[in-house]
């Protein structure tokens, strides 16, 4: 054994004992013939006292082994900021296990470094307490989730990561098959179809911490490879899945964030979330709700609002508390903010702090009658600003106001950063119209989630009558404006599945090609089933108090999908390309077999 104790485990009760420690030189301080070294390992830091002649070669991040006696620090020299701050180790033996070159990245929590440097030297970055504690928290989260699920008799089952390409919204990462030139595997975007097959197979309660891959345009805080806590259950209702989701989340937040979540977690419908917050993942740590003004402003002569109302669209508003104090430049800046989001602008009025009189471009275009009651309708006070959005499409206008709501909360310091606010968003739309014929298929509609999501009871028998209003047994859990998990009850009846395919314009041939193996399995008594998947990177990010999912991933990539550590992705050689069969054309028989399950194999006679 190289060491007898962890550096961070030493306490005053260990005084008088001889220990052997191993770790890195975190800091060195010379004091006239004596050198003090902060020795760091994965458990923490211990102070080691060495003779100068023994330790003069030591530099930061040398890896060393020290044997010595634990003694109490002299009175007045204790360090209350360290768990080991009452003691030190007087070294009797020192062994340099390996030396360290000059550091490209300071291994110091007090010194910030750029993301590119941190990712390029991630192994050094992980020696810092912040990044290291984030990964330890993630490991603890994994263990807690497994404990909750095993308490409920779930099975941890691995599903393939080399599979066939199926449509799930984003592009697949494709892998050429050397032994079958011209054919390709796909890395899974989720274990969705396999976990449903496990339900057909009678596994009933499945989970895995699954690696998933999506070749999508990089935006916001995304990674091309990510992790889900993936769950599926047989013979369950929506309430059963939600109850399990709450059990997992409440245990995680209690043990890792010290926060007791009040259960049941509130539920709001998707349409209510859009109407009140302009988002299907609302941040409930603050108020500032949207107000629809379509009926209130009916009859207005202001062309922007009148045009939207006449088109059967939407006019709404959101209030910025104290917003009237903004300068003209700041108010004009909101127009640039809106245009950056694809809108034409963001109309506004400000209410005089003394008189409450409405001023601004919109005020000049509204009637005295409409202006008189406006503040009461939207809940504004003197000194506030009111922002408006209008459009023939309600959702786009609501989403613009929803984004404004978030920006208002940020600028007006309305967010309690120490608070946790959870909700479920339920009864999501089942379909949405798509104008891209290639994406939508012959039906002109696409599934909001996936084509195996079940309609809710109200729409089960009539979703074809009004696809734009049909609701699904789909549910998302939201924390502080972040969607951290989502799922649905699945279709298990063949007649309902066929009706969905018909609406989506998916022909029997296309269905067999895309989902043949699943449809074949569904001929043999599939149980009612449903599930949920948690975005594990985002869950851990929130628990760690981090600003990006990169902080809780061991070796993350940049926003452009580049890995500064390994310089991946890289070109392949001509020889590799030829051997992998990248340019080969598939044989006709391989194309004919794709996606078909074929006839069922004969069942052996048990006698």
Curated annotation (Swiss-Prot):
Residues 591-607 have a biased composition (Low complexity). L-aspartate binds at residues 168, 214, 449, 490. The lineage of its organism: Bacteria, Bacillati, Actinomycetota, Actinomycetes, Micromonosporales. It holds the Pfam family tRNA_anti-codon. PANTHER family: ASPARTATE--TRNA LIGASE, MITOCHONDRIAL, ASPARTYL/LYSYL-TRNA SYNTHETASE. Residues 578-607 are annotated as: Disordered. It is an enzyme of class 6 (ligase). Keywords: Aminoacyl-tRNA synthetase, ATP-binding, Cytoplasm, Ligase, Nucleotide-binding, Protein biosynthesis. Its EC number is 6.1.1.23. It catalyses: tRNA(Asx) + L-aspartate + ATP = L-aspartyl-tRNA(Asx) + AMP + diphosphate. HAMAP family: Asp_tRNA_synth_type1. Homodimer. Residues 580-590 have a biased composition (Basic and acidic residues). One of its GO terms (biological process) is aspartyl-tRNA aminoacylation. The record marks 31, 76 as: Important for tRNA non-discrimination. The gene is aspS. Residues 192-195 are annotated as: Aspartate. This is Aspartate--tRNA(Asp/Asn) ligase.
């Amino acid at each position: 054994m190289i060491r007898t104790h962890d550096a961070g485990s030493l306490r005053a009760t260990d005084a008088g004992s001889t220990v052997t420690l191993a770790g890195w030189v975190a800091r060195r301080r010379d004091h006239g013939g004596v050198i003090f070294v902060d020795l760091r390992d994965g458990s923490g830091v211990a102070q080691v006292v060495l003779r100068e002649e023994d330790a003069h070669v030591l530099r930061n991040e040398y890896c060393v082994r020290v044997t010595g006696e634990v003694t109490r620090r002299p009175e007045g020299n204790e360090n209350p900021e360290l768990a080991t701050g009452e003691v030190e180790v007087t070294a009797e033996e020192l062994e340099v296990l390996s030396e360290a070159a000059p550091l490209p990245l300071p291994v110091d929590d007090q010194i910030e470094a750029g993301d590119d440097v941190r990712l390029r030297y991630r192994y050094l970055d992980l020696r810092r307490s912040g990044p290291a504690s984030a990964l330890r928290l993630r490991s603890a989260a994994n263990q807690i989730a497994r404990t909750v699920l095993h308490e409920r008799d779930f099975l941890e089952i691995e599903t393939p990561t080399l599979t066939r390409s199926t449509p799930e919204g984003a592009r697949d990462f494709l892998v050429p098959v050397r032994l079958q030139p011209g054919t390709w595997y796909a890395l899974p975007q989720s274990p969705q179809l396999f976990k449903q097959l496990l339900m057909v197979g009678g596994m009933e309660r499945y989970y895995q911490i699954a690696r998933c891959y999506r070749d999508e345009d990089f935006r916001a805080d995304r990674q091309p490879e990510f992790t889900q806590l993936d769950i599926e259950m047989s013979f369950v209702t929506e309430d059963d899945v939600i109850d399990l989701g709450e059990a997992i989340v409440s245990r995680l937040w209690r043990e890792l964030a010290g926060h007791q979540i009040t259960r049941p977690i509130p539920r709001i419908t998707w349409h209510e979330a859009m109407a009140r917050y302009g988002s299907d993942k609302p941040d409930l740590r603050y108020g500032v709700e949207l107000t629809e003004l379509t009926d209130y402003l009916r009859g207005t002569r202001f062309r922007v609002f009148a045009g939207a109302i006449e088109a059967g669209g939407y006019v709404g508003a959101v209030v910025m508390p104290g917003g009237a104090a903004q300068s003209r430049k700041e108010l004009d800046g909101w127009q640039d903010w809106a245009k950056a989001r694809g809108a034409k602008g963001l109309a506004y009025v400000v209410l005089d702090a003394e008189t409450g009189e409405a001023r601004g471009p919109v005020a000049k275009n509204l009637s005295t009658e409409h202006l008189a009651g406006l503040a009461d309708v939207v809940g504004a006070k003197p000194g506030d600003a009111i922002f408006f959005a209008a459009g023939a499409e309600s959702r786009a206008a609501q989403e613009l106001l929803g984004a404004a709501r978030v920006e208002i909360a940020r600028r007006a310091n309305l967010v309690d950063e120490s608070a946790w606010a959870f909700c479920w968003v339920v009864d999501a739309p089942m379909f949405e119209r798509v104008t891209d014929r290639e994406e939508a298929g012959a039906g002109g509609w696409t599934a909001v989630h996936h084509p195996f999501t079940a309609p809710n009871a109200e729409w089960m028998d009539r979703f074809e009558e009004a696809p734009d209003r049909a609701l699904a047994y789909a549910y998302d859990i939201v924390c502080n404006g972040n969607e951290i998990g989502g799922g649905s009850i699945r279709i298990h009846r063949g007649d309902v599945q066929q009706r969905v395919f018909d609406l989506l314009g998916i022909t029997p041939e296309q269905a067999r090609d895309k989902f043949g193996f699943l449809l074949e399995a569904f001929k043999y008594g599939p149980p009612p089933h449903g599930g949920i998947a948690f975005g594990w990177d985002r869950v851990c990010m929130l628990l760690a108090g981090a600003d990006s999912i990169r902080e809780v991933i061991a070796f993350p990539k940049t926003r452009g999908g580049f890995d500064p550590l390994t310089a991946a992705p890289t070109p392949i050689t001509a020889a590799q390309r030829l051997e992998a069969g990248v340019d080969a054309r598939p044989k006709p028989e391989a194309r004919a077999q794709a996606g078909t399950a074929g006839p069922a194999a004969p069942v052996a006679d048990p006698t």
